[in-house]
């Protein structure tokens, strides 16, 4: 049985979807992969969602995570933006569910609190703490990738995460 847990964090967006993969080794968080899924800007929304879905499926197939963590949707005054973001979250969840991966959701403020110690941390503070927690030589960029890594770290710190539940 493996005692390593792999977590895929995702910060959804129709233009940029950040991803971050970490592995838990004992009490250490080890960065595995991070970056962004960027559908071409000239694509129609339906095509962008397909690119996001395929990108997430590739990440799941490549890294075999034990959990997928998605940022919850914030309340937006712009209904159109909220709907588009909700649909991006939906295709991410479908990709994970199709492969039988458990899905967890956390608010941005919860991830910031877990990583920085305050739910009102700036993007810069999140990048800096993610860099320190994962022993990266430079802060992870773009911000979307740092946010995705923060979500994965947040989940790794949750009491619901019991190593035995993820042993393979």
Swiss-Prot record:
- Name the residues that bind Mg(2+) 1: 11, 144
**Gene Ontology annotations for the cellular component aspect, listed alphabetically:** cytoplasm; Holliday junction resolvase complex
- Gene Ontology biological process terms, A to Z: DNA recombination; DNA repair
Q: Which CDD domains match?
A: RuvC (cd16962)
Q: What is its EC number?
A: 3.1.21.10
> For this protein, what reaction is catalysed?
Endonucleolytic cleavage at a junction such as a reciprocal single-stranded crossover between two homologous DNA duplexes (Holliday junction)
Which cofactors is this protein said to need?
Answer: Mg(2+)
Q: Subcellular localization, per the record?
A: Cytoplasm
Locate the active site.
Answer: 11, 71, 144
Key words, A-Z: Cytoplasm, DNA damage, DNA recombination, DNA repair, DNA-binding, Endonuclease, Hydrolase, Magnesium, Metal-binding, Nuclease
Q: List the molecular function annotations (GO) for this entry.
A: crossover junction DNA endonuclease activity; DNA binding; magnesium ion binding
- Function summary: The RuvA-RuvB-RuvC complex processes Holliday junction (HJ) DNA during genetic recombination and DNA repair. Endonuclease that resolves HJ intermediates. Cleaves cruciform DNA by making single-stranded nicks across the HJ at symmetrical positions within the homologous arms, yielding a 5'-phosphate and a 3'-hydroxyl group; requires a central core of homology in the junction. The consensus cleavage sequence is 5'-(A/T)TT(C/G)-3'. Cleavage occurs on the 3'-side of the TT dinucleotide at the point of strand exchange.
Family as reported in the entry's similarity comment: Belongs to the RuvC family.
NCBIfam families this protein is in? PRK00039.2-1, ruvC
Name the chain's protein. Answer: Crossover junction endodeoxyribonuclease RuvC
Query: Origin organism of this chain?
Result: Protochlamydia amoebophila (strain UWE25)
């Amino acid at each position: 049985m493996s005692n390593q847990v792999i977590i895929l964090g995702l910060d959804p967006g129709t233009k940029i979807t950040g991803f971050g993969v970490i592995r838990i080794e004992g009490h250490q968080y080890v960065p595995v992969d991070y970056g962004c899924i960027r559908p071409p800007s000239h694509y129609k929304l339906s095509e962008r969602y397909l690119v996001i879905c395929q990108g997430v499926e590739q990440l799941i197939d490549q890294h075999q995570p034990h959990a997928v963590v998605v940022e919850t949707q914030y309340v937006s005054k712009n209904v159109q933006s909220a709907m588009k973001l909700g649909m991006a979250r939906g295709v991410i969840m479908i990709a994970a569910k199709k492969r039988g991966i458990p899905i967890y959701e956390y608010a941005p403020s919860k991830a910031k609190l877990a990583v920085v110690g305050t739910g009102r941390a700036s993007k810069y503070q999140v990048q800096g703490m993610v860099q320190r927690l994962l022993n990266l030589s430079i802060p992870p960029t773009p911000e979307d990738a740092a946010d995705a890594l923060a979500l994965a770290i947040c989940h790794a710190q949750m009491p619901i995460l019991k190593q035995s539940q993820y042993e393979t």
